[in-house]
């Protein structure tokens, strides 16, 4: 059974801890001791607040469920410790220099960097963009105005541009666009909308190319314990972990 070191003890960490089947959490790390202790107790794991000591513990893979900053700060050390690395905060990889250095380190160490599908679906087949022509590639995200701390009386587009521009202007809304860009090998165009009549995050993907065309719409249910977290994003990590040692590989 795969053993997991969990980096970050927030809402997603607790969801992972509640659904251990084909994996076991043996160590958890958080800078806040109470959070680490709480999750450790829930998962029968050891708690750490010192990262170096955490890395000395016995586990096979590290799952980052903390933040972009944490992924960038600890990613290289995790790979150099001989562990594969699951990056939930995929927005960390929007930094080209960081991403290239991290990939090079993974190659040197013979390790893998895993990016879960997160809050969207269809990420596997979007990878056809790496080997075929993509003509149109658009992500339209719609959120409630309150989630972005703005006011709007009707559906309003507040951003239209390339993914890297959206990351600059709306850094808390980068994970989906970066996951799509990495999957396709092609930067996605982004529209960000607010709609006072929606209480969920909606992601619509429009893609057309050599393969044909597709439209994907995901209306996310918030995590039961944290409305700011997509429940689908948490489930995507669980799916990844459950299938790591499955001899039957499904999907591209």
Where are these regions (language model features)?
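Short, hydrophobic beta-strand segments that form beta-sheet elements in well-ordered domains
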Residues: 6, 26-30, 62
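NAD(P)-binding Rossmann-fold cofactor-contacting core
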Residues: 23-40
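Active-site-lining helix/loop region of Rossmann-like oxidoreductase modules
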Residues: 113-114, 119-252
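Rossmann-fold NAD(P)-binding glycine/threonine-rich loop
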Residues: 90-110
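Glycine-rich adenosine-cofactor-binding loop
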Residues: 3-16
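Beta-loop-alpha module in the N-terminal Rossmann-like domain of NAD(P)-dependent dehydrogenases
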Residues: 49-80, 92-96
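General beta-strand structural signal in soluble alpha/beta enzymes
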Residues: 64, 87, 113-117
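A short helix->loop->beta-strand "cap" motif at the edges of active sites that frequently abuts
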Residues: 45, 81-84, 108-111
């Amino acid at each position: 059974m795969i053993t997991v070191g969990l980096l970050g003890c927030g809402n997603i960490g607790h969801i992972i801890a509640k659904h251990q089947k084909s994996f076991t959490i043996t160590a958890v790390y958080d800078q806040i001791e109470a959070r680490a202790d709480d999750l450790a107790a829930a998962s029968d794991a050891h708690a750490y607040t010192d990262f170096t000591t955490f890395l000395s513990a016995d586990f096979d893979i590290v799952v980052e469920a903390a933040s972009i900053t944490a992924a960038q700060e600890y990613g290289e050390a995790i790979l150099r410790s001989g562990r594969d690395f699951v990056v939930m905060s995929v927005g960390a990889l929007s930094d080209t220099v960081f991403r290239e250095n991290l990939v090079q380190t993974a190659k040197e160490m013979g390790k893998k960097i895993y990016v879960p599908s997160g809050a969207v679906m269809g990420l596997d087949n979007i990878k056809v963009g790496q080997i075929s022509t993509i003509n149109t590639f658009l992500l339209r995200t719609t959120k409630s105005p309150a989630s972005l701390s703005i006011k709007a009386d009707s559906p309003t587009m507040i951003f239209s541009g390339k993914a890297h521009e959206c990351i600059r202007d709306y850094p808390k809304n980068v994970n989906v666009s970066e996951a799509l860009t990495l999957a396709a090998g092609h930067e996605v165009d982004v529209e960000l909308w607010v709609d006072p009549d929606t209480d969920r995050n909606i992601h619509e993907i429009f893609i057309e190319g050599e393969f044909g065309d597709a439209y994907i719409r995901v209306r996310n249910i918030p995590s039961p314990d944290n409305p700011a977290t997509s429940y689908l994003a948490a489930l995507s990590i669980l799916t990844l972990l459950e299938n790591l040692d499955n001899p039957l590989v499904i999907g591209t």
